[in-house]
Amino acid sequence: DYTNPEAMTWWHGLQQHVFDLGIDGWKLDGTATLFWSNLGPIPMFYKKTYAGLMTTRTYMDHYYRDEYQHALTQNPEFATLSRAMDRGFHPEGFAPIDASPVNWVGDQEHKWITDEMIAGTGKDKIDIAMDGIEGFESAIKSILKSASSGYNIIGSDVAGFSGKTIPPRLYIRWTQFSAFCGLFMNGGHGERRLWKRSAEELEIIRQYSWLHTELVPYMYH
């Protein structure tokens, strides 16, 4: 409970061991765990906290801001990686812009298209908010939407987060796109060890990884 002073004193004490190592940032995910219920991934909309009755949204904003503001007292250049706007509804919500210096949008599958899949009928028509049938196309849209809303450094899981097999062409194309995003994050399911993938993928992804590194001074300054 991030509103409980005693709990936060204990938690910040645990974090101090990591701060003392000199880390520069970490990823914030699973923001609504205090609100989880027997409804599965959908959290309760209200819950009694130490500070009183709070909405899921209010509590998550409190969580994001506490993590970021406390971290800045330990390292003035600390950055938290938080979720920007990636769906109309998401059980984890979105981070407030003032406490989200670095952002990702998720969780896409290892697929190319979105609209054509959603437009299907019958068993092919799946609720995107709950089952996550998203792809490369939706990552691009979410990044642009987040940027237009005021989020700054934004990216996505290269080739998507969910699935067993990453198509080679998709891995290459998503990498090329991500090289020009503020965040280049090669995370998620599927084979990510590039030396286990094709020689073509290894060479192209290496080139664009270096290109992204060369662009860092331009992107951040």
Which residues are covered by each model-predicted region?
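Catalytic-domain carbohydrate-binding cleft regions of carbohydrate-active enzymes
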Residues: D1-H221
